[in-house]
Regions:
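Acidic, Ala/Val/Gly-enriched low-complexity intrinsically disordered segments
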Residues: 8-15, 23, 27
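Short, flexible hinge/linker loops that cap or flank conserved catalytic cores
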Residues: 13, 31-34, 158
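A cross-family phosphate/adenosyl-ligand binding-site feature
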Residues: 30-131, 169-204, 208-209, 215-225
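Arginine/glycine-rich "motif VI" loop of SF2 helicases in the C-terminal RecA-like domain
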Residues: 88, 154-162, 188-190
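Active-site/ligand-binding-proximal alpha/beta "capping" segment
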Residues: 123-158, 165, 217-222
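Glycine-rich phosphate/nucleotide-binding loop
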Residues: 138, 159-162, 170-175
Length: 225
């Protein structure tokens, strides 16, 4: 059973301001305020192993069952759809943010508690970051990598102090972590930079830490990106 309310599509400009208000008025009377809000980056494909979709669903269930809110890219395909569906089914709120150009390609999820349609990828990422209190990267492709690295860079530069997690399911990110250590050994990354990302293979343990530490503020200065 879905708990998502009727979505409101928000376009940029003056109209979007009104629509954002309507979303808020629609949602508040029926749902409790979330105790934390985790932005999940993940693939719009399901991947070769069914375990990836199961992992995304497990992540969404945990968020919903613990009174949280999912912020994500607004699509219904792949891991994105799996994490959103599971959050909704577990009673959680889901905030989807998707560019107009991807509404058809990524099949915008009309069951979201809030579904914001924006013009650009920059607007998408900034709104997702602003609505989140923590970030988590699941397995995915270059879009997932780009979002993860940008969020990490923003943290390094001091634009936010929100926790960042990397779920290294079944060694999916082993190669990436090895390369990052290589970059550090070659002097391109400071030793404390890796400490800004919480890496774990167990979703529940990682999610608990992210939810518990989700109290950092996202600086408006990040809008310059």
């Amino acid at each position: 059973m879905q708990t998502g309310l009727t979505p409101v599509f928000a376009a940029p400009g003056a109209v979007s301001s009104l629509l954002f208000i309507l979303v808020s008025l629609n949602a508040c009377p029926f749902m409790k305020e979330p105790t934390f809000s985790i932005c999940v980056y993940c693939g719009s494909r399901s991947g070769a192993d069914p375990a990836f979709a199961a992992l995304a669903a497990q992540t969404g269930r945990w968020i919903g069952q613990h009174g949280g809110q999912l912020v994500y890219g607004g699509g219904k395909n792949g891991l994105m759809g799996a994490v959103a569906d599971a959050t909704l089914q577990a009673g959680g709120r889901v905030i989807g943010v998707i560019p107009q150009a991807l509404v058809e390609r990524e099949h915008a999820h009309r069951g979201c508690t809030e579904l914001h349609v924006v013009q650009t990828m920059h607007e998408r990422k900034h709104l997702m970051a602003a609505r989140a209190s923590a970030f988590l990267a699941l397995p995915g492709g270059i879009g997932t990598f780009e979002e993860f690295f940008e969020t990490w860079t923003w943290r390094q530069l001091g634009y936010h102090a929100k926790p960042i997690g990397l779920l290294n399911h079944d060694g999916f990110y082993d190669g990436l972590l090895s390369f990052l250590r290589h970059s550090q050994a070659q002097g391109f990354m400071s030793p404390d930079l890796m400490a800004l990302v919480d890496v774990d293979t167990h979703p529940a343990a990682l999610l608990e830490r992210l939810a518990r530490g989700a109290d950092g503020e996202f600086s408006p200065l990040a809008a310059v990106f």
